[in-house]
Design a protein with these regions (language model features):
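Positively charged n-region of N-terminal signal peptides that target proteins for export
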Residues: 1-6, 187
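N-terminal, active-site-proximal structural segment of metallo-dependent hydrolase catalytic domains
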Residues: 7-10, 18-97, 110-113, 173, ...
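Metal-dependent phosphoester-hydrolase catalytic domains
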Residues: 23-31, 146, 182-183, 191-259
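Structured beta-strand-rich core segments of catalytic domains in phosphoester-bond hydrolases
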Residues: 34, 80-155, 160-163, 225-249
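Structural recognition of the beta-strand scaffold that forms the well-ordered cores
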Residues: 44-45, 72-77, 104-105, 121-122, ...
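Alpha-helical structural signal in soluble globular domains
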Residues: 94-102, 174, 199-208
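His/acidic metal-ligating clusters that form di-metal
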Residues: 144-160, 165-204
Length: 259
């Protein structure tokens, strides 16, 4: 009887060890090894404030940084368009010309008193075959553009900037309708609104269909922060933050297309 008991105890211990090893193996499978050949780089140039992007530097400084940094898409935050006497002046177009990129302006809101459209400019490397801007609310737009991520892998690059509480719910509604396996959404949101944005996303999107990441920056007290929203077909791998001029920084986001 004693030998049978010891035998059963031995079997139980071996079984526990086997299950433990299997669990560890499964955990490893949940986090695949980083394949840098399937990784796209998205650049975000920002003060992470309401400040116009070019208030403390020249177009050429930003264009030079763009030309010398590996990327597939560049987002110029707060390149506000100003109504001139004869035309609308978009400060992002000069950088596009200097860096030989195709610009798309994405509005956030309209300031009637200052006669300007607050928004950002997204720079693409070549002619755009597909591009749509969806209304979030009032003047705020959600950009969706098909472009190459890396090595023949396409993505639907999306962008939106959220500067008020009333934009959160309609923006998340757009995410729910538009986010699919190809989506790589890079946006900015007021830091004070970030908890609400995360909460509404959690309540409205199915947990196993998306990944939401706040991109950490050196200044944890910045008025705005960057976020990345993708399907589980993509993985945010990290960010490299460099100074361009004064408090204008370039954030090089590394996002991998998973097999």
């Amino acid at each position: 009887m004693k030998s049978n008991y010891l035998y059963l105890l031995f079997i139980c211990v071996i079984s526990c060890l086997f299950v433990s090893c299997s669990d560890e193996d499964n955990k490893g499978e949940d986090i695949p090894e980083w394949n840098r050949f399937r990784t796209t780089n998205v650049l975000v140039y920002a003060h992470l404030s309401e400040q116009n992007l070019f208030s403390s530097c020249s177009y050429k400084e930003v264009a030079s940084s763009i030309r010398n940094t590996v990327h597939s898409v560049a987002l110029l935050d707060r390149t506000n368009a100003v109504y001139g006497q004869t035309a609308i002046i978009n400060t992002g177009t000069e950088t596009a010309r200097e860096s030989k990129k195709v610009p798309v302006f994405v509005p956030v809101s309209y300031s009637n008193g200052e006669k300007k459209i607050i928004g950002s400019t997204v720079l693409f490397p070549s002619t755009i075959s597909e591009m749509t801007q969806y209304v979030v609310k009032n003047d705020c737009r959600y950009l969706e553009t098909k472009t190459e991520a890396v090595n023949g892998i396409d993505m639907l690059f999306c962008s939106v900037s959220l500067n008020s509480e009333d934009l959160i719910a309609p923006a998340v509604d757009a995410f729910k309708k538009k986010v699919n396996e190809q989506t790589v959404l890079v946006g900015t949101v007021k830091r004070a609104l970030l908890p609400n944005l995360e909460s509404v996303i959690t309540s409205n999107l199915t947990s196993d269909t998306y990944s939401f990441v706040e991109v950490e920056n050196r200044n944890r007290d910045s008025e705005y922060c960057i976020f990345v929203l993708t399907s589980h077909k993509w993985a945010f791998r990290g960010v490299t933050e460099t100074s361009v001029s004064g408090d204008l920084h370039c954030f090089q986001l590394q996002i991998e297309s998973l097999k």
